[in-house]
Curated annotation (Swiss-Prot):
Transmembrane segments: none annotated. This is Heat shock protein 90 homolog. Coiled coil: none annotated. The TPR repeat-binding motif mediates interaction with TPR repeat-containing proteins. The keyword Chaperone applies. Homodimer. Molecular chaperone that promotes the maturation, structural maintenance and proper regulation of specific target proteins involved for instance in cell cycle control and signal transduction. Undergoes a functional cycle that is linked to its ATPase activity. This cycle probably induces conformational changes in the client proteins, thereby causing their activation. Interacts dynamically with various co-chaperones that modulate its substrate recognition, ATPase cycle and chaperone function. Residues 213-226 have a biased composition (Acidic residues). It comes from Podospora anserina.
C-alpha cells in the first residue's frame, strides 16, 4: 500500500523554481545524479573496510546509465549503500537541507542553476528534464522500496515487490517530450565526458548495437523437403557429396544490449602532471567540487621517500557561501589509500584556515581499515598535513606573482590568510607576505608589508597601522596627523579579523608592528624632545584639572605631541582592547561580560598644546577654576567628541545630544525656554537672545 507524504515547504518552492526554470544548461542533472551515485558507492565501500560482509549483496561497485527510447525513460543505477524507507522519506522530501534556502536565494538573485550541487540538493535537478521521477532503493538494513513523485507537492512511497536490485539505488526519469535528446548515446557520452569523466567508479552506458548473425534458413529447408517427393534421378558419382550437404543459413539483423564503459581514464592524480592538460584539470576540478566555474590555480605534486603520497590541490575562484559555517563539516579534501576512497571527512588532513582548498590525497602508507578515530591519531596524517600546508603556501606565492590573479584570490580568501596568521604560528611569517592593505601612501591600490618596508624612511623604526570600521573613517583620524608630518606610512586595517591577525604577528622582517590608536612611543629628534618636555610642564596643571573633572571615565590625561590638528583624542593602553576591538566584542551576541569589563580599554585622554581650543581652555581653567559650570561642560563635550572621533561609542547618547542642541541654540541666538520666547514681545526677543548667549554655556551640564 502506497503512503503519501507532503514535501517540506522549502523543497516545494525549490521544485517549483526548478520545474519552471528557463535555464538552457539542463544537462547538469546527469552530473548531479552520477555524483550522488558515486557518494553512495563511497559510503558502502567505506563500511565494507571494517565489515566485508556488507558487500555480500553485491561486490561489483558501479554506476549504470540505461536509456529506453521506447518508454522515454533514462535510468541511473548504482550498487551503493542504498536508502531505507526512513532515508527516502527524509532525504527526498520532508527534511530540507541547510542549503535549500540559500540555493533558492542564490537562484532568485540570478545565480546559475548549475550551482545546485554545492548546496546539497542536486537530486531535485532531475526535474529539469523529467516530469515524473521514480526511485527504487534497497539498503542492507531494510526492504526494497519505491519512491515516486511528479513534484506536485506530494510524493508516494511503497514496498517494491518487483525484481530485487540487490543493493543500491535506481533512479528512473520519465523524460519530458522536449528532453528526449538525453536518450541519445552521443549526448549521454558528451555530458559524462564533460562532467563526470573522473568519477572513481566505472560508469557503464547500456547501448543497443545492431549486428548481423547467421541463422538456419527454415524456408530453404522446407523447399528441399518438398523436393524429396519428386521422382529421383540416380547419379552414381556424387553419393559422397550428398551425404555431406550443409544446412542452409541466412543473415538477419539482431539488436543486442551492450555495456560500454565511459570513464576508462585512470585517476588523474596518478598521471604525470606534464601529460595533463588544463582542460583535464578543469574537468576533474568540476567533478570533484560541483563548481560550475574553472579553478583559479592548481598544484599537482607527489612526495616520495620514507612517506609516499600523491595529491592535487585546487584554489577556487570564489569563496563558497558557507565558508565559515562552523557546524558544517568541511569535505573539500578526499582521502584515498592506494586508489581506494577512504573519507572526505578527515578534518586533521588540512587546517581550518585552509578549508577553501579542494583536492585529493592518495597515500601509499596508510592502512586501508582506518576509522575516523584512528585517522586523528595517525602520525602519517600529521606528515601529510604538513606537506599539504607547505604546498598550498607555495601555490599562493605563485598566484601572487600575477597581480590580476592574486587580486581575485585575495578578494575571496583574505580572511582565510588572516585566520592562518592568527592560528598557525609555524607559517605566520610566510602568510604575512601575502597580506595586502590600503595605506596613507597606497592610494586606491593595496600594498604588501614587504613594499611598506622598502618605503620606510631611515629614521623610522616601527611599522604603523590604524584599526577602524572603514577606510573612510580611519583616513580622517586625528591619530594620523603626526605620522603624516614625519612622512611615516600608516596601514589601514578595516576588516574585523585584521586586528586579531596583527596581535599575533607582532613584527615583520624585524620591524615591530604598532597600533597608533594605542599608547606608543613616536620617534623624535632632540629638539622635538625638548619642546615636548617644555609643553608637558606648561600644561601639567590643565591635565590634572581635566582628570579631576572626568574622574574614572579616563585613566589619565596627558599632554600629547602626537596630535596636530585635533584638540584632543582618546588612546588606549598597550594591553587592553583598542577602540575597534571593543566595538567588535560588543557586537558579539554570546560575549563574556566579565571578560569585557576586564579587557575594556584603559582610556588616556590626550590634549594638544598646539590647539587654539586647548590654549583657550587653559586660560579659562586658570581664571575660573576646574569647578566652573562652563569649564565642566566644555570638558565633557570635548571628551565625548573625542570618544566618537577615536572610534568609541558614547554611553549616554541622549545627554550628548542635549549638550549639542544647547550649543546649536547658542549659535543661533535662541532662547533656552522656547515657550517663554514665544510669549515675549518681538521687540524683546533680541535682548533675550543676547542675554542667553552669555549664560548658555554655564547651563550646559
Amino acid at each position: 500500500m502506497a503512503e503519501t507524504f507532503e514535501f517540506q515547504a522549502e523543497i516545494s518552492q525549490l521544485l517549483s523554481l526548478i520545474i519552471n526554470t528557463v535555464y538552457s544548461n539542463k544537462e547538469i542533472f546527469l552530473r548531479e545524479l552520477v555524483s550522488n551515485a558515486s557518494d553512495a558507492l563511497d559510503k558502502i565501500r567505506y563500511e565494507s573496510l571494517s565489515d566485508p560482509s556488507k558487500l555480500d549483496t553485491g561486490k561489483d561497485l558501479r554506476i549504470d546509465i540505461i536509456p529506453d527510447k521506447e518508454n522515454k525513460t533514462l535510468t541511473i543505477q548504482d550498487t551503493g549503500i542504498g536508502m531505507t524507507k526512513a532515508d527516502l522519506v527524509n532525504n527526498l522530501g520532508t527534511i530540507a537541507r541547510s542549503g535549500t534556502k540559500q540555493f533558492m536565494e542564490a537562484l532568485t538573485a540570478g545565480a546559475d542553476i548549475s550551482m545546485i550541487g554545492q548546496f546539497g540538493v542536486g537530486f531535485y535537478s532531475a526535474y529539469l528534464v523529467a516530469d515524473r521521477v521514480t526511485v527504487v532503493s534497497k539498503n542492507n538494513d531494510d526492504e526494497q522500496y519505491i519512491w515516486e513523485s511528479s513534484a506536485g507537492g506530494t510524493f508516494n512511497i511503497s514496498p517494491d515487490n518487483g525484481p530485487s536490485i540487490g543493493r543500491g539505488t535506481k533512479i528512473i526519469l520519465h523524460l519530458k517530450d522536449e528532453q528526449t535528446d538525453y536518450l541519445n548515446e552521443s549526448k549521454i557520452k558528451e555530458v559524462i565526458k564533460k562532467h563526470s569523466e573522473f568519477i572513481s567508479y566505472p560508469i557503464y552506458l547500456h547501448v543497443q548495437k545492431e549486428t548481423e548473425v547467421e541463422v538456419p534458413d527454415e524456408e530453404a529447408e522446407t523447399v528441399e523437403e518438398g523436393d524429396d517427393k519428386k521422382p529421383k534421378i540416380e547419379e552414381v558419382e556424387d553419393d559422397e557429396e550428398d551425404k555431406e550437404k550443409k544446412p542452409k543459413t541466412k543473415k538477419v539483423k539482431e539488436v543486442k544490449t551492450e555495456e560500454e564503459e565511459l570513464n576508462k581514464q585512470k585517476p588523474i592524480w596518478t598521471r604525470n602532471p606534464q601529460d595533463i592538460t588544463q582542460e583535464e584539470y578543469a574537468a576533474f576540478y568540476k567533478s570533484l567540487s560541483n563548481d560550475w566555474e574553472d579553478h583559479l590555480a592548481v598544484k599537482h605534486f607527489s612526495v616520495e621517500g620514507q612517506l609516499e603520497f600523491k595529491a592535487i590541490l585546487f584554489v577556487p575562484k570564489r569563496a563558497p557561501f558557507d565558508l565559515f559555517e562552523t557546524k558544517k563539516t568541511k569535505n573539500n579534501i578526499k582521502l584515498y589509500v592506494r586508489r581506494v576512497f577512504i573519507t572526505d571527512d578527515a578534518t586533521d588532513l588540512i587546517p581550518e584556515w585552509l578549508s577553501f582548498v579542494k583536492g585529493v590525497v592518495d597515500s601509499e602508507d596508510l592502512p586501508l581499515n582506518l576509522s575516523r578515530e584512528t585517522l586523528q591519531q595517525n602520525k602519517i596524517m600529521k606528515v601529510i598535513r604538513k606537506n599539504i600546508v607547505k604546498k598550498a603556501l607555495e601555490l599562493f606565492t605563485e598566484i601572487a606573482e600575477d597581480k590580476e590573479q592574486f587580486d581575485k584570490f585575495y578578494t575571496a580568501f583574505s580572511k582565510n590568510i588572516k585566520l592562518g596568521i592568527h592560528e598557525d604560528s609555524q607559517n605566520r611569517n610566510t602568510l604575512a607576505k601575502l597580506l595586502r592593505f590600503n595605506s596613507t601612501k597606497s592610494g586606491d591600490e593595496q600594498t604588501s608589508l614587504s613594499d611598506y618596508v622598502t618605503r620606510m624612511p631611515e629614521h623610522q623604526k616601527n611599522m604603523y597601522y590604524i584599526t577602524g570600521e572603514s577606510i573612510k573613517a580611519v583616513s580622517k583620524s586625528p591619530f594620523l596627523d603626526s605620522l603624516k608630518e614625519k612622512g611615516f606610512e600608516v596601514l589601514f586595517l578595516v576588516d574585523p579579523i585584521d586586528e586579531y591577525a596583527m596581535t599575533q604577528l607582532k613584527e615583520f622582517e624585524g620591524k615591530k608592528l604598532v597600533d597608533i590608536t594605542k599608547d606608543f612611543e613616536l620617534e623624535e629628534t632632540e629638539e622635538e624632545k625638548k619642546q615636548r618636555e617644555a609643553e608637558e610642564k606648561e600644561y601639567d596643571g590643565l591635565a590634572k584639572a581635566l582628570k579631576n573633572v572626568l574622574g574614572d571615565k579616563v585613566e589619565k590625561v596627558v599632554v600629547s605631541h602626537k596630535l596636530v590638528g585635533a584638540p584632543c583624542a582618546i588612546r588606549t593602553g598597550q594591553f587592553g582592547w583598542s577602540a575597534n576591538m571593543e566595538r567588535i566584542m560588543k557586537a558579539q551576541a554570546l560575549r563574556d561580560t566579565s571578560m569585557s569589563s576586564y579587557m575594556s580599554s584603559k582610556k588616556t585622554f590626550e590634549i594638544s598644546p598646539k590647539s587654539p581650543i586647548i590654549k583657550e581652555l587653559k586660560q579659562k581653567v586658570e581664571a575660573d577654576g576646574e569647578n566652573d559650570k562652563t569649564v565642566k561642560s566644555i570638558v565633557q563635550l570635548l571628551f565625548e567628541t573625542s570618544l566618537l572621533v577615536s572610534g568609541f561609542t558614547i554611553e549616554e547618547p541622549a545627554g550628548f545630544a542635549e549638550r549639542i542642541h544647547k550649543l546649536v541654540a547658542l549659535g543661533l541666538n535662541l532662547d533656552e525656554e522656547p515657550e517663554a520666547a514665544a510669549d515675549a514681545p518681538a521687540a524683546d526677543a533680541g535682548v533675550a537672545a543676547a542675554e542667553t548667549s552669555d549664560n548658555a554655556m554655564e547651563e550646559v551640564d
